[in-house]
């Protein structure tokens, strides 16, 4: 609740509005540093996961996450949870019944379909009608708790089209609107775009991202591929932002402040916003430094996420990468100038190369510094002088000058 209270008090006015309970909330012995193979899980009589009451005391008495969700909603926030694809192996072992059917868990499970990194579940055999019934039952339970957001894991690597479609049907039948986010997205191909749009609200385009420059730099190519296909209700997701104090009770690594430099953090948030990736945090907000709050509340940057269209990479020349987008509320244009190299870059760029139409004049403001831009001329044409630092960004909003 400390994270939720902090978010409501400091970040909600800037659009940060959802708190998600991450992986293995149903395992009493869950730990940092990995997963327990063959763990005993807290399940109900129909093989559905229940919050471990030693970790979530408000779930006692069969209340599930409803008391916690109610508290989150009272703060003006939305409540989400993580869930693994399929049905618990424990339910299969115990031949638990599937609610509302004559089937049991061992009849609807596909025991050949397993997650490579977690032993909690088997996949479902969707040739058996009880498989859909299991997902329907699970989502009815989540809806009764007041869940608004579901991160469904182990869905995309490989691509489990049948599981994804079944989960979508279960949400639609649940009687509650819930956002469906799919993970983990390893080497996700655009060949799946139509199916993703039909069944999910957002989907990861990479494996887990951590606080290393190599992880951030790799997202440039992925988001250049996916950004032109972003649209409301169908979002390619570049993964959580590893800023502030991270890795508390994480699968990998020890608790620490992010290893990303301030410039790298600004680059990351700028790329995510101009590519219109959903923004999710994976940090402990109350113990994060004040500069993290400043990073996450820059309206000039966040506005690009919510009021832009036609996001695209314009140029990749050595370590210089240019992105552009257009405002949905005015004639303004957004331009991000990234430097992925280890030394500073100074260039003068014609405004025409930034996608700014003529005729007419433009003024520009840099979002991170708040300073006016260094507009100049190059070979008689209007131009922008830029000097982004190593691993850094300069992020501009251009407005037409009225005569």
Segments and roles (model prediction):
Residues 352-370:
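Solvent-exposed beta-hairpin/edge-strand motifs
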Residues 15-22, 78-83, 143, 148-153, ...:
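Structural recognition of the beta-strand scaffold that forms the well-ordered cores
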Residues 267-315:
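Catalytic cores of secreted or luminal carbohydrate-active enzymes
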Residues 377-403:
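C-terminal beta-strand-rich structural cap/linker in extracellular carbohydrate-active enzymes
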Residues 3, 7-143, 147-149, 154, ...:
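Aromatic-lined carbohydrate-binding/catalytic grooves of carbohydrate-active enzymes
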Residues 138-186:
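Extracytoplasmic, non-cytosolic globular domains
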Residues 266, 272-275, 280-282, 316-356, ...:
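Carbohydrate-binding surface patches
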Residues 107-113, 126-127, 133, 177-284:
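Glycan-recognition surfaces
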